[in-house]
Curated annotation (Swiss-Prot):
Its EC number is 2.5.1.72. The keyword Cytoplasm applies. This is Quinolinate synthase. The lineage of its organism: Archaea, Methanobacteriati, Methanobacteriota, Stenosarchaea group, Halobacteria. [4Fe-4S] cluster binds at C116, C236, C327. Catalyzes the condensation of iminoaspartate with dihydroxyacetone phosphate to form quinolinate. Transmembrane segments: none annotated. It comes from Halobacterium salinarum (strain ATCC 700922 / JCM 11081 / NRC-1) (Halobacterium halobium). GO terms for molecular function: 4 iron, 4 sulfur cluster binding; metal ion binding; quinolinate synthetase A activity.
Length: 374
């Protein structure tokens, strides 16, 4: 596949129409910021709901009405009666919320710079070109595309249009089973590690091939034709950082340590862990732990910090200690931005509203509905 012509058309950040934070808000002290957020929320009342992803910093989570993973928060958005949904997350999450909420509701992302790099690793132009190459390599086979929830609305729409669906980290294995009941081959996007871990779970570890959209030569037709699962070469920069050595080190430092990791981690890390699951699973695992147990957390550092605070009776440690990363995209949701968008709503002005194209939204909803039927 020749990708040379794509270079000027592709961007890892889908939303570039961001509004700069006014200087007044950049200079707010933490105390003044909190007071103004609380005052604006009091004035807006039930007209606004604030959602905070598990990976958000403490200053956002403390102002959130609901805290959870992206799918949990989208469901909370759909159930909310509020006119305004402020999403403390990243762009693909706000898109999903916009798709499933009522048309009368506005979904607001405090900072448009909160763009997930992994979601940006599978852009529509690349996927269209890859789909043409992959289907040409296996012309007599039915290929079912599956996209992880961590993707933009246009990719969700593409997968639905081609007969595929959306999945979460919790139901990826059921999505694969669904696809193989209807087709011969799966194209999984954008996270290769979740795809590989799911293939292992289904006993199909040797049936995969990795597709690098940036490699001009792509994969040979024979490699694609021989594989049952084509894995898009995308990944989470936070979770890819974890290594088996981190697991060994934490077990050496804590004799009775248990290790729980996210399935976006490398296969070798998943194999070395005691429990593997979504952020909801990680949260539940620590909540159910006996007092005095040690749990090493292999995911974004803010969730590990939240769990330490929420469950002081459990010894919660980051899997890679001080080297554990925060998510740079999540970090863009600064509490000063939250104060700004709230006070703008008080004045009747909506800032940074996420609006998915209606045709894309309709198709993406089909992919989400297929997931819900699993």
């Amino acid at each position: 596949m020749d990708t040379s012509s794509f270079e000027t058309d592709l961007s890892l950040f889908k939303y570039d129409d961001l509004e700069a934070l006014p200087d007044e808000y950049r200079e707010l002290t933490p105390t003044a910021r909190t007071e103004r957020i609380e005052a604006a929320r009091a004035e807006l009342g039930d007209d606004v709901v604030v959602l905070g992803h598990n990976y958000q910093r403490r200053e956002i989570v403390e102002h959130a009405d609901f805290v959870g993973d992206s799918y949990q928060l989208s469901k909370e958005a759909a159930n909310a009666d509020a006119d305004y949904v402020i999403f403390g997350g990243v762009t693909f999450m706000a898109e999903s919320a916009d798709i499933i909420t009522d048309d009368s509701q506005s979904v607001i992302l405090p900072s448009m710079e909160a763009s997930c790099p992994m979601a940006g690793m599978a852009e529509a132009l690349q996927v269209d070109a890859a789909w043409a190459d992959i289907t040409a390599a296996a012309p007599d086979e039915t290929i079912i595309p599956i996209t992880y929830m961590n993707s933009y609305a246009d990719l969700k729409a593409f997968c639905a249009e081609q007969g595929g669906l959306v999945c979460t980290s919790s139901n990826a294995h059921r999505a694969f089973e669904w696809a193989f009941e209807r087709g011969d081959k799966v194209l999984f996007l954008p996270d290769k590690h979740l795809g590989e871990n799911t293939a292992h779970r289904l006993g199909m570890a040797d049936a995969t091939v990795e597709w690098d959209p940036w490699a001009a030569e792509g994969k040979t037709a024979e490699e694609v034709a021989d594989a049952d699962i084509v894995l898009w070469d995308g990944y989470c920069q936070v979770h890819e950082r974890f290594t088996p050595e981190h697991v060994a080190e934490v077990r050496a430092d804590h004799e009775d340590a248990n290790v729980v990791v996210h399935p976006e981690c490398r296969r070798e890390v998943v194999e070395a862990a005691d429990v593997v699951g979504s952020t909801a699973t990680i949260t539940e695992t620590v909540a159910d732990a006996d007092p005095g147990e040690t749990w090493a957390i292999g995911t974004e550092i803010h969730l590990a910090n939240h769990l330490q605070r929420w469950h002081p009776e459990v010894n919660v440690v980051p899997l890679c200690g001080d080297a554990c990363m925060d998510c740079n995209a999540m970090r863009q949701i600064d509490p000063n931005y939250l104060a700004w968008v709230l006070e703008e709503l008080v004045e009747g002005r909506e800032r940074n509203v996420i609006e998915v194209d209606s045709e894309e939204a309709e198709l993406a909803q089909v992919g989400l509905d297929r997931m819900l039927e699993l």
